[in-house]
């Protein structure tokens, strides 16, 4: 099973991003469907069902010691990674607690046999794949609150990739 841990975007936030993207861009690559928008915390890749069960158990044990906090993210910058051809929207700055959450989840995934992700954590929402160049555009300012994270399975189908939630974990509500 090909899996990853991520923050889900609320439906209205995903549609807001898709509307902005679709108004700004022509054909610069393959657009990611709004239903697939997410912010990856830890890429797991292929892992057996028994290893995924261990991951769920260790995650629940870690959370039993106290849920990490949720938070708010302002998506206010765009970026481009030429090697994979990814054009993305992300935060210019993000809460340290988000980096800590991603770091802990990456540690838990490698502890159950997932390959260690050597890339630095850079929160982002992928807008386009197979993008040959970074389009010059001013980023919007779209904020959203994250209150849980999700274990997703990635499935390849006739119409492309789809992501299916397998497990959700709550985060402590942010104090405002």
Model-derived features: where do they sit?
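Histidine-dependent nucleotide/RNA phosphoesterase domain, centered on the 2H-phosphoesterase fold
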Residues: 1-176
């Amino acid at each position: 099973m090909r899996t990853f841990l991520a923050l889900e975007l609320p439906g209205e936030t995903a549609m807001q991003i898709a509307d902005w993207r679709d108004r700004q861009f022509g054909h610069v690559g393959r657009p990611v469907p709004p239903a697939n928008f997410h912010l990856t915390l830890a890429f797991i890749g292929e892992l057996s069902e028994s290893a995924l069960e261990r991951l769920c158990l260790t995650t629940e044990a870690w959370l039993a010691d106290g849920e990490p906090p949720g938070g708010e993210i302002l998506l206010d910058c765009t970026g481009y990674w030429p090697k994979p051809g990814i054009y993305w929207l992300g935060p210019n700055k993000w809460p340290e607690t988000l980096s800590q959450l991603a770091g802990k989840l990456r540690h838990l995934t490698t502890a159950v046999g997932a390959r260690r992700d050597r890339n630095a954590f850079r929160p982002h929402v992928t807008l386009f794949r197979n993008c040959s160049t970074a389009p010059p555009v001013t980023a919007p300012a779209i904020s959203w609150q994250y209150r849980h994270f999700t274990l997703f399975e990635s499935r390849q189908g006739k119409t492309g990739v789809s992501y299916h939630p397998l497990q959700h974990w709550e985060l402590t509500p942010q104090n405002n």
